[in-house]
Amino acid sequence: MSTIPLSLDFSITPNVVSPAGSAVDANGLMLTDNELIPVGAVQSYYSSSDVSALMGSDSKEFLAAQQYFNGYDNSSVIPGELLMYRLVTADAAGYLLSGNMKGVTLATLKATPAGTIKLVVDGTVVTSTSIDLSAATSFTDIADKVETGIGDTKVSVEWLPIANRFIIRSATTGADSQVSFAYADSGAIATALKLTEATAATVSPGSDAVSMTDTMNNVINTNQNWILFQALTELTDEQKTELCAWASASHNRYGYVVHDTSAAPTVANNASCFVQSVVVANGYENIFPIYGSYLYAVTALAYAASIDFARTNGRISFKFRGFSGLAPNVSDLATAQALKSNGYNFYGSYSLNKTMAQYASDGAITGKFVWLDSFIDQVWINANLVGAYANLFTANQSYPFNANGYGAVQAATIDVAEQAVTFGAIQRGVVLDNAQIRIVNTSVGKDISATLYSQGWYLFIPTQTGSARLARDLQGVIFYWVDGQLIQSITMSSTAIL
């Protein structure tokens, strides 16, 4: 179901001042070309076993889900939901996928009375010839009999042993390709083979090829309860570029975790690697580049989905996180420095003296927020501000353009701000640069540095014009908050006093 974004009425523009509850879940979204993900539907999975039951334990979808649901080592929570969406890079056939046949024996199906199956294929109602399963020798043989009954010029039918399902594909591809649920009055055959909606069958519409941009727009028109996304499919540089452009234009709402398996990032200061030649050259923001296969990209999604926003001091950086089941893919200083010079994150093996550690590095994301945790925090804060204001204005009250109205907005903001302080997204006691203080004070017309130091945040509501009141739009409001950043390295001297 498509919805009107709340940002139509509550528009919050993320911004930063650089040095001289939960209204959104940090779920991960994975793009895949697997046919078993229905076209146009955002599929939710709540465990890796849900994925393997459909796509098998050797599928990249299961391997990614397994890594995702593990979260990061020692996390206080683990991911609760994984989203997947199908990439359609070529015209696709519509299909009908049966309900799960696990536990249904061949003998049971052979005992089903002969009958017909009625469904719609490519817009035309089709009734099969009588299908007799009494002499079937296997589930594959049953698929052949169903295909013959419906007509092999209209459909192809296949038994999927890993998924334990039958799939009936249209013989055509494209937007007009279609196979509907079997009609409820089809009879015993359709019910026994679980081809009806009542028996948990699934339909996927046919589709023309869909661009990366349209794919992502279709996703957010269906589901916005996620922050980071990645592709399990190996995309071309042109397709990756299109996804980078989309993420960069998302107003700091979504981040693209792009993986790179080529050797180019391991050459220091390499202007021809993807990040430098595409991401940096075009100024794309909200891109989290990571060296390695799609499994290494999963670490960013697993990290984000394991953040406990309800925990006191729950904020934690991506750097130093360990991911069980994943081997480090960088173990020498030269490669690590080369990757950093090109803007890539990686999973490293570190050691000095007898101390050894495996952890992710460095957690950098392109754009104004610089670090992945800061990026995720601002998405969470802004989403919760929208949620707070939506609750405020739908609570059967109205708020005028005076101290009472502004106070109500301030009160709604306080709950979000204090939760962010408790979590650690907003930090108190941070000494800002003089340049930062000057920019903020100039914007609000007074010195608020003491408030930012002691409180960590400040809500600025300027005097409203008559035209703003007439439009009923509270304009120019700015929520200042101090991120504070996190310590990720130590440079010091060790001095012996003799």
Predicted segment positions?
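Polar low-complexity, Ser/Thr/Gly/Ala/Asp/Asn-rich disordered segments used for subunit assembly
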Residues: M1-A26, D33-I37, V42-L295, N434-I439
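Structured, hydrophobic secondary-structure cores that serve as assembly/anchoring elements
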Residues: M1-F62, N70-P79, A360-L498
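A glycine- and small-residue-enriched flexible loop/hinge signal that marks low-structured segments
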Residues: D73, T148, I220-S398, R428-G429, ...
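Short beta-strand elements
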Residues: I117, Y350-L352, F479-D483
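Generic structural signal for bulky hydrophobic/aromatic residues embedded
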Residues: G149, A171, L232, A357, ...
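Short glycine-centered helix-capping/turn motifs at secondary-structure transition points
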Residues: T153, K194, G343, G424-A425
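Short, surface-exposed charged micro-motifs
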Residues: K154-E158, G343, Y347, I478
